[in-house]
């Protein structure tokens, strides 16, 4: 009997996409579901960016694009990195990919050999360990729990590094927790990493502009770290362009050349019209980015306030992104008489079926005591969702 490859069978399906799909199916049945499982802004792409895309269509940007991306877009990314982050790159040190997800995977596949270890602080984005496994590497999970604001310490990093370590994947601001590493915390991690120049850092900075505690700081900005860091970023979150599928990597030229070789064999260049839209995003008026950030911060404050009023939840204070990651383990072992809650996946499914609110269990993110709620939705939806959750949890004994 024909079977899927062992490589594919090693991969787990995306829990976030699975919950979003389940939510969509219930909505199609006429059920009023509030979807707080999705990881994308609810805003529309700014008009000036859409106009640039329309102009690109009229100017017949409809052919294959260069594998690493149009030079003008890469120049815009280089300028962004210099002006916003104080980092000097050339266009040969930048590659554009089909969304941030492909870019992260490109970097992993370009550097990780079978048997190599990749350090991943938990909680983590669901796809990181799966990408490492796809490359034949071994994910080394470092638990950074609620009590340490979900951030790995320098001591934990030092203890996790072995002779097999190839990479650290670091996401700040974080999906799923919203935690942001401070400049001082990144400096401490950098001091450890500089003692191990063979270990690369894949810095996922896709939520860079959704930051509530000040200007973003990249670990690549730490003295002596730039050649050890590959930055992954893109337009999806900051510019509400998730469906345009444009991300980028910036790093040492030899690594970017490797990613170019890889990308050339399995996706080639990204959508030409999307690239022109992304170029506009980086070069035109940036006021919409700040307007969306302010709205997310207001929603953050609202959901934290309301969630703290729900008995049994221990609520974190996100410093960035648009996720809340509360502890829900006080409900484990409880039941509504029909269904028992044994773990965070059960907890999230109970909320979907009983409260009609879609969330994601923390098991998928490497922290079984918590669950993730996205507040990339309206204030009204946040208020109604927490009300439903509170009522549903009140039925558990």
Predicted region positions:
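PLP-dependent class I/II
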Residues: 2-4, 8, 12-14, 19, ...
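Generic structural signal for well-ordered alpha-helical scaffold segments
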Residues: 24, 78, 82, 108-109
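A glycine-/small-polar-enriched, mobile loop at the entrance of the PLP active site in fold-type I
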Residues: 37-40, 55-73
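Conserved N-terminal alpha-helix of the aminotransferase class I/II PLP-enzyme fold
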Residues: 64-97
């Amino acid at each position: 009997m024909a079977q899927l490859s062992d490589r594919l069978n090693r991969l787990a399906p995306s829990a976030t996409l699975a919950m979003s799909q389940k939510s969509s199916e219930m909505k199609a049945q006429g059920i009023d579901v509030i979807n707080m499982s999705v990881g994308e802004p609810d805003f529309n792409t700014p008009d000036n960016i859409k106009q640039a895309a329309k102009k690109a269509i009229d100017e017949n940007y409809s052919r294959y694009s260069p594998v690493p991306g149009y030079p003008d877009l890469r120049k815009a990314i280089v300028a962004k990195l210099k002006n916003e982050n104080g980092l000097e790159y050339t266009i040969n040190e930048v590659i554009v990919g089909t969304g941030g997800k492909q870019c992260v995977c490109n970097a992993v596949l370009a550097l990780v050999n079978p048997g190599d270890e990749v350090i991943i602080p938990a909680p983590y984005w669901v796809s990181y360990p799966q990408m490492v496994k796809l490359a034949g590497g071994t994910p080394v999970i470092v638990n950074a729990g609620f009590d340490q604001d979900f951030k790995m310490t320098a001591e934990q990093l030092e203890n996790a590094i072995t002779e097999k370590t190839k990479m650290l994947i670091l996401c700040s601001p974080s999906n799923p927790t919203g935690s942001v590493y401070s400049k001082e915390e990144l400096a401490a991690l950098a001091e450890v990493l500089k003692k191990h120049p063979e270990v690369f850092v894949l810095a996922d900075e896709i939520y860079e502009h959704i930051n509530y505690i000040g200007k973003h700081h990249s670990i690549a900005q730490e003295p002596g770290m730039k050649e050890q860091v590959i930055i992954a970023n893109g337009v999806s979150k900051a510019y509400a362009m998730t469906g345009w599928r444009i991300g980028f990597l910036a790093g040492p030229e030899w690594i970017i050349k490797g990613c170019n070789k890889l990308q050339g064999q399995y996706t080639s260049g990204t959508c030409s019209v999307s690239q022109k839209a992304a170029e506009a995003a980086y070069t035109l008026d940036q006021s919409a980015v700040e307007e969306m950030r302010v709205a997310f911060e207001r929603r953050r404050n609202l959901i934290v306030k309301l969630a703290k009023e729900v008995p049994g939840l221990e609520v974190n204070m996100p410093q960035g992104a648009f996720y809340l990651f509360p502890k829900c383990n006080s409900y484990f072992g409880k039941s509504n008489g029909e269904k028992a809650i044994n773990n965070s996946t059960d907890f999230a499914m109970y909320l979907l079926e009983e409260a009609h609110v879609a969330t994601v269990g923390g098991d998928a993110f490497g922290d079984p005591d918590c669950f993730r709620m996205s507040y990339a939705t309206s204030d009204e939806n946040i208020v109604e969702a927490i009300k439903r959750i509170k009522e549903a949890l009140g039925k558990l004994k």
